[in-house]
Amino acid sequence: MAGEGDQVASDAPVPSAVADSNGVESGNRPSSSNPEPSSDKKRVRTGSQDIDMADAPVKRQKGVAPIKAECVALPNIFIIHRSDNKAEVKTAPIDDDAAEAADARHKAGDSRDNRAGAKGKNNKKDKKQKGQNTSRTFGSSHDKLPLCGTRALSNEFSAPECRFGDKCKFEHDLRKYLKEGRREDLTTFDGQCPIYEVRGYCHLGWKCRFVGSHSEERATEHGRQELVLREDAERKAKFAGLEDDEVEVVNILPKEVRFGLSRRKIGTPRSDQYLEWINSNKDQERELFDNNQGDTEALKEERDARRAEYVEAPFRPSEKRRLYYGPETPVLAPLTTQGNMPYRRLCVDLGCQVTWSEMAMGMPLIQGERGEWALMKAHESEIAAPRFQSKGTVVQGYDNAADIRFGAQIAANKPWLANKTVEVLTDNCPKLRAIDLNCGCPINLVCEKGSGSALLDSEAKLENILRGMNYVSKEVPITVKVRMGTKDNHPTAQKLIKRLVLGGYEALASDKGTSGVAAITLHGRSKQQRYSKSADWSYIAECASLINRLKKEKDAQTDTAAEADPRDQANGGHVYFVGNGDCYSHEDYYNHMNNANVDSVMIGRGALIKPWIFEEIEKGQYLDKSATERLAYIEKFAKYGLQTWGSDELGIGTTRRFLLEWLSFAHRYVPVGLLEHLPPNIQDRPPRFRGRNDLETLMASEHYLDWIKLSEMFLGKAPPTFKFEPKHKSNAYEIEAEG
């Protein structure tokens, strides 16, 4: 899920480091070993070097981005354009629950509030669009005359017979389809098909909107002109034996496995054995708690023997692949909707070292639902090893060459569901860095079922879920993402972390061992808080200190009854700790690394607004990206989207939809060259401003029509049937039919 955090206070000045669009640096790079955090007393003024602002204090308005006066276009208010040509003045920041696919039921006064609508039907037009769109639709993208599948991949005179004959509802006349049944070819990407460029063929054939780049008209031996599809034999040979959806993509679920899961013909033997073992021990555990003065060693040996009866050589957490987190491994948060494969691929290009899938629900996975399994797909760039410079704590046995970047995040509300989900994932997804259990999602739809943040109030249950996941996950490590707690001013994360690292009393007494998690990620907000306040990095720092103390405490438990079984401790007993919340610059990143003492920082909204934050972290400087460079990232996303979802009308529509989802965040970026002071704050909202050129101004627009214009630069004009509803109702868009 998305989310990031606020700065740790300090009296030391922040090093100034700003680069122009060509990456020319001014100032010093922050060092992970020599912390130089930011200060409210001394700030860096852009356009100059290391200016001490104590001599020339400038009042900074809370919640408002400090844009240079000459760039401000209107008074200091935020304006949202609407299709009725009215403007709604916005004085509060947009709720960023859109990054977590939040529903609107927690909001008062949203579209479900009938106070305004009770006056009658005629009042509907005056009703403001607020809150979240919970049941969104996106129209349809299809050809005017759908082409029959027997013709799609065949040359004009070589198509097989359609078994439906004249009764077929689809078009068989190829020339008629090309002339009347589809829109004209796109001229973007130099008119070259992005799929053909990689594969040497296009699996969409005549349906491709770039078909002119891989087709031609040839004369036959009978003097007729035939339309034929071209192929590049050399490039095509590189992917021989692969299905169309397996080119440059891993973790593809075979059709027969998906069919078997949906028909319940594929079992989960490891989970069944583990659950049977747990259930068989319930009576003995009760006896243990009734008489806890018994022979602990004898009971331990008895349980080991019983475990061997039910589970055949299970993988213990300590036998799993080792993980590593360090200053050189910034993490991209699991982002619902926005965290799709093309976007993750773009972030990896820009320096992201660890990626996570969108949160997948457990039940659809074990039922073989195609949409949920699609979330497990990863691009081949995500299975490369993350950067490794041995700057952090390296556990014994860590093999960077065997490590990859991509992990899967799941949500589950019961031990049996989590166990079975992990088992089918590890059996069918060979490229997973780790599997993360989401205990931070605050949305009602998830929490009402007992998943997400709801697990924070059930610590023993959560521990049991994670322990079971470890038993069935083979060599794949298990991690967990949590929040501070469920309620404001009542954080519970420290208590939970202690249980997860050391093990709860009942688990240790019954010899179940610790949870075995290899890493814990903490989002510095509560479930109730959402994004109304900045993330609490001081609390994250306290939790990081706690984990360091717990390591010493575990060492002190040697030869005691409370000692955890070393076989149940992942990463040789070292639990990595990752902070999450409001990271928006390399200064934020290194501040958190140095002052909160986390092993790494997970970045969500900051990466949505400016994906090159990973590049800034690597180079240790601000990068003042030009509008042209930012447009190139949009072009790259569009290209990756077409390679993922297809270059036909349907694939272009899907790519456009997810591009607009990203632009609903990316338009918030304020170029650092327009700011009076650094570092920028992700919670600050800018007044309406003029960019340094028309393109930069366009890219900062909150108007949904301008997002459409940007998409049309690379995906062509949106069809009349296209409809876009962003998660914020104020930005909803439905294209008007021409004429």
Swiss-Prot record:
First and last residues of each zinc finger (C3H1-type): 143-175, 192-217
Binding locations of FMN: P334, L335, T336, Q409, K481, H523, N580, G581, D582, G604, R605
Cofactor: FMN
Region Disordered, annotated ranges: 1-64, 98-142
Biased composition (Basic residues): 121-130
Coiled coil: none
Keyword annotations: Cytoplasm, Flavoprotein, FMN, Metal-binding, mRNA processing, NAD, NADP, Nucleus, Oxidoreductase, Repeat, tRNA processing, Zinc, Zinc-finger
Subcellular location: Cytoplasm; Nucleus
Main location: cytoplasm
Keyword Phosphoprotein (UniProt): no
Keyword Repeat among record annotations: yes
Compositionally biased region (Low complexity): 8-37
Protein role: Catalyzes the synthesis of dihydrouridine, a modified base found in the D-loop of most tRNAs. Specifically modifies U47 in cytoplasmic tRNAs. Catalyzes the synthesis of dihydrouridine in some mRNAs, thereby affecting their translation.
Family: Belongs to the Dus family. Dus3 subfamily.
Name under which the protein is recorded: tRNA-dihydrouridine(47) synthase [NAD(P)(+)]
Naturally occurring in which organism (per UniProt): Phaeosphaeria nodorum (strain SN15 / ATCC MYA-4574 / FGSC 10173)
The encoding gene: DUS3
